[in-house]
Each structure stands twice: as structure tokens, then as C-alpha cells.
Amino acid sequence: MKTNCEFPLLCLLIVLVANVEGEVEDNELKMVKRLWRNWEDPEQRQLLDQEAEQEKQREKRLWRNWEDLELRQLLNEFAENQREKRLWRNWERRQVANEDDGEKPKELWRNWEDLKRRQVGRFE
């Protein structure tokens, strides 16, 4: 079990209090004692600090990757919506050009916009 404690005195106190109350197993107490010895040893403390820093960097990298993925998904969704709107505008223009009565394409366009609004409302 790999554990690292930023506040070894606090960790030791918590485990000791829990041990007095009988809530800590021997191996957990041994782990805390080992952590405390490592904390007292400058080389071990430096290794623990490096491991903690590497873990923080890894978490930052994972977070950035997740944010990048989320942004790409939003951009793709936006691009798809823009593409749909462009297709419908082009379709509407062709309908208006082909028909004498320009109300029907406008009504279809309004129906399509209402449908999209209802779909968005359903997912929010």
C-alpha cells in the first residue's frame, strides 16, 4: 500500500487515537510508523515529496486532458448545430425559390426550430 501523508504528526496522532480506541489494525500502525520514519529521514522525505509532486502533475495532466476532451465535444456539437442550420437555410432558400408560396418553408423552419428547442430542453 503506497501512502503519503503531508502532515505526519497529524496522521500519527489520528492513528494513535484510533489505536487507543481499538479501531486500527497492527499493520496500519506499522504503516504509520514507517511513514513517520521515512518523514524523519531526509532522503526518504525527498522521495515522498517527489512522488507527491509527480502525483499532482499527473492529476493536473489528467484534468487538462479531460477539459480538452470536453471542449472538443462542445466544439463538435456546436459545429454540427451550425452545419444543420446551414443545411436547413439552404433547403429553405431552395424551397422559396421553387414555390410561389414562401410561407410553407418558413413554417417548416419554425417547426424544426421548435423541435430543436424541445430536444435541448429535454437534455438540460
Swiss-Prot record:
Presence of keyword Secreted: yes
One Gene Ontology term of the molecular function aspect: toxin activity
Assigned GO CC terms: extracellular region
Positions annotated as RLWRNWE repeat: 34-40, 61-67, 86-92, 107-113
Signal peptide: 1-22
Residues making up the propeptide: 23-94, 112-124
Record's keyword terms, sorted: Cleavage on pair of basic residues, Pyrrolidone carboxylic acid, Repeat, Secreted, Signal, Toxin
Subcellular compartments: Secreted
Residue ranges crossing the lipid bilayer per the database entry: none
Residue(s) carrying Pyrrolidone carboxylic acid: 95
Expression tissues: Expressed by the venom gland.
Similarity-based family: Belongs to the scoloptoxin-08 family.
Protein name stated in the entry: U-scoloptoxin-Er5d
Native organism: Ethmostigmus rubripes
